[in-house]
UniProtKB/Swiss-Prot annotation:
InterPro entries xrefs: Restrct_endonuc-II-like (IPR011335), tRNA_endonuc-like_dom_sf (IPR011856), UPF0102_YraN-like (IPR003509)
Domain of life of the organism encoding this protein: Bacteria
SUPFAM superfamilies recorded: Restriction endonuclease-like
Protein name listed in UniProt: UPF0102 protein GDI1964/Gdia_0189
PANTHER family xrefs: UPF0102 PROTEIN YRAN
Length: 127
């Protein structure tokens, strides 16, 4: 007989599914705005970048956040996570020498209730 999943595990699975859905919504939003998705869920030893996209000579590394409200989503990216994203982006650029770009930046896409997308371009910078 299998044990019932714990409440924490059920909540975690639901959060994971919401996150996947938010990434799909964010990716579609980027494409509607002229971006080409280069990678989805790009994994590195420093962590995962949700979306890597390019438009013209600009590459963006996107973190997707899914929250019920804009303010809580905007506040959910900490300094340690920013550092991990920067390290992961540097590794991805080195691992993909075929990517041609003049500029790169870090964007945050906030997906809130009703799949509304709020785009924060150049959300943080390399220090």
């Amino acid at each position: 007989m299998m044990a019932e999943p714990t409440r924490r595990r059920v909540r975690g699975a639901a959060s994971y599914q919401r996150g996947l859905q938010a990434e799909q919504v964010a990716g579609a939003w980027l494409q509607e705005h002229g971006w080409t998705i280069l990678m989805h869920r790009a994994r590195t030893r420093w962590g995962e970048i949700d979306l890597v996209a390019q438009r013209g000579a600009m590459i963006v590394f996107c973190e997707v956040k899914c929250r019920p409200h804009y303010t809580t989503a905007a506040e959910s990216l900490g300094r340690a996570q920013m550092r991990r994203l920067m390290n992961a982006a540097a590794w991805l650029c080195a691992a993909h020498p075929g990517w041609i770009y003049d500029e790169m930046r870090f964007d945050v896409l906030l997906v809130t209730a009703g799949d509304a997308v709020h785009h924060i371009a150049d959300a943080f910078r390399l220090e």
